Regions:
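Helix-coil-helix junctions within alpha-helical repeat/solenoid scaffolds
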Residues: 1-175
Length: 175
């Protein structure tokens, strides 16, 4: 299992660097290793990573399918952390793909944030707040966007998560 997570984590990182083809191959390799080993535990996380890779490359339809797979697996395996991540990504993808479904996107992101807060997973619930602010910004709701982004910025600063703090600040500059 550590090898599969290493492959998927590497792919996720490659996606942030803009190398989406390598990213997808690496995450898919991680998924294959995990499936071949017959281990379902943490498999949803691999699909969340693959979803993020597809999202970052602009393939929102594939991102949605992978997130739905992650959500289904996380619920069937009772993996609450992955379920929270899946809801956040599902909402982010929905909001970007269909701005008219902003309410549904908001609901999904908030559901994911709530799950992650219940698990005391502050870095990831804060990421959900960033994505919610991004969703509001993309639908022209500047006040709601700023409220969520300011909260996320403070939390990222407190946790020393400079990359995400800086991304949050860039979004705030757009308001």
């Amino acid at each position: 299992m550590p090898l599969s997570l290493a492959c998927s984590g590497l792919g996720h990182a490659c996606s942030f660097l803009g190398d989406h083809a390598t990213a997808a191959k690496s995450v898919e390799k991680g998924i294959k290793i995990q499936i071949d080993a017959g281990i379902e535990w943490w498999l949803p996380l691999h699909y969340v990573f693959l979803s993020a890779v597809c999202f970052n490359s602009g393939d929102l339809e594939k991102a949605r399918r992978h997130t739905e797979k992650a959500l289904q697996l996380s619920q069937s395996n009772s993996e609450r952390w992955s379920e929270g991540q899946s809801f956040i990504w599902l909402g982010r993808i929905l909001g970007r793909s269909y701005p008219s479904k902003r309410d549904e996107a908001e609901e999904d992101i908030l559901r994911g944030i709530k799950i992650l807060e219940e698990l005391n997973s502050k870095p990831f619930s804060t990421l959900g707040c960033l994505f919610l602010g991004e969703c509001y910004l993309e639908t022209g709701e500047k006040e709601k966007a700023m409220e969520n982004l300011k909260g996320a910025e403070v939390m990222f600063q407190q946790m020393g998560m400079e990359y995400w703090r800086d991304r949050t600040r860039k979004l705030m500059e757009m308001i």
